[in-house]
Amino acid sequence: CCLFVVSVFLLVVGAVWHLPEIVTVSNNVYGKELPIQSVETEEKKAVLTFECAWDHSSIKDILEILEDHNVRAAFFVTGDWVKQYPEDVRRIVQGGHDIGNHSATHRNMVQLEKEEIEKELKETHQAVKELTGKEMKFFRPPYGAFNDTVILTAKEGGYLTVMGNIDSMDWKDYGAKTILRTVMEDKELQGGSIIRLNSEAKYTKEALPKLIESLEREGFRLVTLSQLLYQEAYHLDVKGRQIPDDR
């Protein structure tokens, strides 16, 4: 009886945490683990990424704007957000967007022990899997706070830690024009850029249509993280730019 219970427990735990199929990557630069900030790509591609942690009042409009412009993006969700707004999570997945792990409770991962980091990731991973059937593979730590333990723990769970080289700063609530200017005038904006936005920021949905149009006017093709990132055989430079090993 006890053996049966233990076996079932191990099966359940195994279902929660997923392992990478192939580990042939290096996020270590000069002895320090780094998140992916951008991607070396021949084509002028970029990704819009949204963080979803608190409110959901703008998510419907954001998804409609993306659909109207035939754009797919990436949404990083917390476990708490998933529990509160399951229908929005389903809409994200049904819309063809990537969905990523943003922890369970939006705590600062750097301040947590390894076991606590694992718990934060596992809870959200399982919640999304049960709701949508999706196995998430991208992780963005809350507050942009990371260290070697955070990145390596995520990697052990099959996750690529992804930040972004362009921060819209939309959370400062300076207005739609400021968001647009901040992104479009950033000197780091280039092919392979990962753009950070917050779904609950006050002016994000207002800025989004013009942001999409401006990026496309500059020749960018907006894609998902799954379409942009290398899943294996890559390394990072000192800026966290993902470069395939054959270059």
What do the predicted segments below correspond to?
Residues 21-112, 116-127, 132, 136, ...:
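Active-site beta->alpha N-cap acidic-glycine motif
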